[in-house]
Swiss-Prot record:
NCBIfam families: L21 (TIGR00061). Coiled coil: none annotated. The keyword Repeat does not apply. This is Large ribosomal subunit protein bL21. Part of the 50S ribosomal subunit. Contacts protein L20. One of its GO terms (cellular component) is ribonucleoprotein complex. It comes from Leptothrix cholodnii (strain ATCC 51168 / LMG 8142 / SP-6).
Length: 103
């Protein structure tokens, strides 16, 4: 069974046993969280699509790690004007282990 969940403004297709990296969630490492924003549920040819959410469906996950992605370098330049601007950004993430898909 798989589910399409929404967290951090993004959508992820998940199944039990998978590991995913999502936008940072305020939770401790080892803590179990419940995601109730399930947009769709499916198993084989059977698919249940929510309007916008599937009622009673939840996904439970365990927090494996809190971390930061690799640095993204931003470089702006105006030719012939001696203008250069450098900037870097590292986005925070939470790594989750999907325990169960219920619904």
């Amino acid at each position: 069974m798989y589910a399409v969940i929404k967290t951090g403004g993004k959508q992820y297709k998940v199944a039990a046993g998978e590991k995913i990296k999502v936008e940072q969630i305020a939770a401790e490492v080892g803590q179990e969280i419940v995601i109730d924003q399930v947009l769709a549920l499916g198993s084989g040819a059977d698919l249940k699509i929510g309007t916008p959410l599937v009622e009673g469906a939840t996904v439970t996950a365990t927090v494996l790690a809190q971390g930061r992605h690799d640095k993204v370098r931003i470089f702006k330049m105006r030719r012939r004007k001696h203008y250069q601007k450098r900037q870097g950004h590292r986005q925070n993430f939470t790594e989750l282990q999907i325990s169960a898909v219920l619904g």
